[in-house]
């Protein structure tokens, strides 16, 4: 590290030069202002200054750290009148962190010092008492000795004075001495006993007091620590927002996340390096030697962030991606993979794991698991509906089904007294028509389905949404493929079947034959003991149409059809399309409740508020009850036909459910594609190059898109594959043209047209655009286009045969075969075969063909010629030369 002079160091730390030189001198280093100061001398000076200020340990570790933070942000909130205003948001935070280890050490050290002091005082008092006892015993002994000496002197004096009474005085004196000794001994023993008891009592009191003080100190510390822990948890869990505005709170949280994310990315520099730089980096100066980091010394603060992983609630759905699970647990995905490997399961970061496995992993890592059903939100939204009204009788929903051109729409046309059939392209129905009619005996709702083979999905939807199926069978045609399919749909849906035998006015009509054919498919007439009603009608002349209506109403009475007439409505999407002027339009058949203008409707992956409602005649209406078909406007997109339409309370929740359904549909679609890729991997590896016909399909309604797409995909073969790169409802736009150009596709429009910008883009890119109004023509032309993409088939056709009569040698060409043409025609430059005993021995081509000395292009049957075979000289007499040509055969799709 670069050494600084004394003057430069004083400028960095903000201390006068003279003052710094005095401090260096006190530390034992005499320096001038121009002298250099090394890192060791700086360390020595710092230690000296700390000792001067009373820090004996030579280090100063902060025990309390206070962090203050202030963030400013600008928030745009909505104001009155559709305007917005900017609000300055300032968030101030102050947090104090206490080093718990320091508090615990101080408390423990204080308790130990107090106990040590008490023990020292107790030992001191015991020593003083012992000294007092020894002094008393010594005084007693001295007193006893003095008394004894005095007694001896007195006795000697008395013996001298009174010789006569010596014996008597001696006896009395001995008795007195004995009594005095006994009494003194008793007093000394009593005094010693009292002193020992007093010392023991005081020692016990002091020990009890010391124990009580230690207990109180421990309780106070425990209470203080628990209170600090509680406050810390409350601070962490409390809502620290300084405003009640939702927008301000969101802005504050975003600012916090940004700051905390930036703080985590910054590297913490060692304290020694910071100290030696004198705070240059804090003031914005450029530091040197960024690549070399000094080792941390004791000057680094002792506050360390806890490395313990926070335990939290982990919400797990039915399936979850491993990386998402790791993100919810705030750990790296590699840690989750390690835990799974310990549990005996191998996984990758993008692998989808089930709910049970994810629960085991999360619990293994110490988190609390909250299991959530995937359709929990959907169930909550659909259950929050007012559907407790009383059920009342409703009109039957009748679906007209049958083979194409058997008179379904004509029958319905006669009932409605309109001319719907003439409006359909080619006289065939290509959409589901929903109508309700009033009869003398009540209302009936009719669904008219297409009979063409391509509209299988439409017929299936019609059968699912219906109460009664009317099967129209032409008396002259009998049972046809779509007739059988309609029977299967009706049986699968579990709805009763009424057979309408149409076209009985024709001469070749044979109703009995129809009954016999239908009996093979378990459709037995009532007169034969079955359950199906047969009605003979003529849609053209209107024969027995009333009888058909009576049969329908009779069947509906038997079914006892009821529905809730009031409350929030629910129904099914019969058809949908994209109208250029009105947006997404859906035909909905209301099945229960009342659909009102302004209701919030959830249709599959789409949602919206009903802006307008129209009946089948195009009239504006405000409400629709059960069994009434209506067109609704206002959805977010074009729903799929067959989706359930439900009125909900909250538009926000409806949007969430729709988005969830869209995400789920995408997951299922991707999973299906992945499965298809895995299943077809081997076949794709073994198969050769496959021609691909890319198609951009646009139609007027959703049902037609589905039907055409399904029919086109069924045309795919092993050699030519149809790929629908784009499809949708509505007119052809410039986006469709760009997509077709990028994918080298053709554009097929079914009952739709391209706008001006799309036409310009199509002409500029030379994209093939075709319009259709009848599905027959569309499918036939796509078949022809696919046939043109098939690899051609080549066939070898023999055009002539020549017999070798002689062989000549030519200096230029080698062996020349003199031949007689026995069959067909010999042409020059055609491929040939040389046959010997009817076995091919060489295959090549003609190099020279001459008649006499002239080169000719061909030689006919019965003429002689000379033939030179290219690169072959082993021609012998008797060989046959076979001339053939390769013919290309055009292939078509069967």
Swiss-Prot record:
Residues 25-304 are annotated as: Disordered. Residues 448-451 are annotated as: G3. Its main location: cytoplasm. GTP binds at residues 402-409, 448-452, 502-505. Residues 33-44, 52-62, 101-174, 184-239, 247-263 have a biased composition (Basic and acidic residues). GO terms for molecular function: GTP binding; GTPase activity; guanosine tetraphosphate binding; translation initiation factor activity. One of its GO terms (cellular component) is cytosol. One of the essential components for the initiation of protein synthesis. Protects formylmethionyl-tRNA from spontaneous hydrolysis and promotes its binding to the 30S ribosomal subunits. Also involved in the hydrolysis of GTP during the formation of the 70S ribosomal complex. This is Translation initiation factor IF-2. The lineage of its organism: Bacteria, Pseudomonadati, Pseudomonadota, Gammaproteobacteria, Vibrionales. The gene is infB.
